[in-house]
Amino acid sequence: MRTRAAFVIGVLLAAPVVSGFSRTLIAAQQPQPAPTPRAAAPVDLTGYWISIVTEDWRWRMVTPPKGDYASVPMTPAARKVADGWDPKRDTAAGEACRAYGAGAIMRVPGRIHITWENDTTLRVDTEAGTQTRLFRFGTAAPAGEPSWQGRSLAQWQISGGRRGAPPAGGSLKVVTTGLRAGYLRKNGVPYSANAIVTEYYNRTNEPNGDTWLVVTTVVEDPVYLNGRFVTSSHFKKAADGSAWKPTPCEAS
């Protein structure tokens, strides 16, 4: 009788433990909320970066002369627009920022500052033209009036590691639409409001301690381009923002 009573008491005492374990097991089996894009970032792109111009000097560091359209796959309609380029007219019309839109802004020399606007939106501010770009993960901004920076939809691209190992890294892909017509170069080489800008942001760490950001930009435009216009822009990580000096747009 004593043995049976002891067994019953033991079962009763163990019941809360078993019940608690079951609740823990059930909770562990429940689907967990997906991490935010900020928490899931495979690479840190935040900070101040300064553009390092090592190629296309004649089109980036100075305003090229009218008619210098080399390497851009322009349609006849694009050439007609570019041949009529008039920076004074653009300034008078309030369109001095035509060369500072999403199709070309990463090619304009200067610094950029990347921060998180919130857990689902990366923000890029530029010294040149004092522009702000918002890269939204998951859902693009609601359709509205076309703008210089348009509407940008972002997604992380994860690089695979070895089997069973965590991801080795990754990059950022951004697709921008909803653009206001602008210039690919300051001498009037145009892109239309139908253009689609696809960008890839890759960060690299060099053995000497330097950190680089390489932005590959692909512009597609059924109106003004015969093919894809692809460029790569290089930025070096800056220690801080002490040299940050935003400047207004200039048409020439």
PLM segments and residue spans:
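N-terminal low-hydrophobic presequence detector
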Residues: 1-5, 9
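PEST-like low-complexity, intrinsically disordered acidic/proline/serine-rich tracts
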Residues: 2-3, 25-252
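Bacterial N-terminal signal peptides
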Residues: 8-19, 23
